[in-house]
Amino acid sequence: MTIICIDGIIGAGKSTVTHRLKKNLYKCYEEPIDKWTLLPNLYNDMKKYATPFQFQVLFSQYDQYLSFKDCKETVVVERCPWTSKNIFTSLMIENNLFDLSAIDTYNNLYERLSYQVDHFIYIKVDSEMAFERIKKRDRFAEQNISFDYLKSLENKYATSLATLSPSTVTIIDGSNTIEEVEFDVKTAINNFLSH
């Protein structure tokens, strides 16, 4: 099985692209946000909810993995445990939002529950565009996302993706139309699978 991860900051267009790919017969798994009962609370009080929320995300991603682990086809996931640990949890630790006494437990669980991604497709948009998209779609759980938080995510992705082998990451311009982004993502998937 080959696992490809669609990634990007909040508001990049990951969910829209993943949903469109699913309609085109790709085996896709969107972020299991329906299991993230702590998400609405997170942006209201990050200090209180960051740690339990990141555990909740990790467990939900593992549950999702169990549903496709025996699949023989190529699987496309929206975000993955690597993102949870290296982007969101890492950023929360840097900002003193993650309970330091839980880091070892989180890392141990991550080692047991994470899975290997073969290729990342990063939909790149700047934080200004992402912020406008978030305001426009007006999701309840995202009402308190700050521009500064998006900017810090954008920077964190830039530094974290740079640690991966360049052959495992494709960067797509997410400022294009959704049709163009979808086309570019499909092209990236096909290029990766043909090598």
UniProtKB/Swiss-Prot annotation:
Q: Which SUPFAM superfamilies match?
A: P-loop containing nucleoside triphosphate hydrolases
Give the family, as the similarity comment puts it: Belongs to the DCK/DGK family.
**EC number(s) on record?**
2.7.-.-
**Which GO terms fall under molecular function for this chain's record?**
ATP binding; deoxynucleoside kinase activity
Residue numbers annotated as active site? 78 (proton acceptor)
Q: Which residues bind ATP?
A: 8-16
Which Pfam families does the record associate with it? dNK
Organism domain of life: Viruses
Q: What is this protein called?
A: Putative kinase protein 143R
| Statement: the UniProt record of this protein carries the keyword Chaperone | no
InterPro entries in the record, alphabetically? DCK/DGK, Deoxyribonucleoside_kinase, DNK_dom, P-loop_NTPase
Alphabetized, the UniProt keywords read:
ATP-binding, Kinase, Nucleotide-binding, Transferase
Provide the binding site for substrate. 31, 43, 54, 79, 142
In its UniProt entry, the species of origin is given as Invertebrate iridescent virus 6
Gene3D superfamilies (alphabetical): P-loop containing nucleotide triphosphate hydrolases
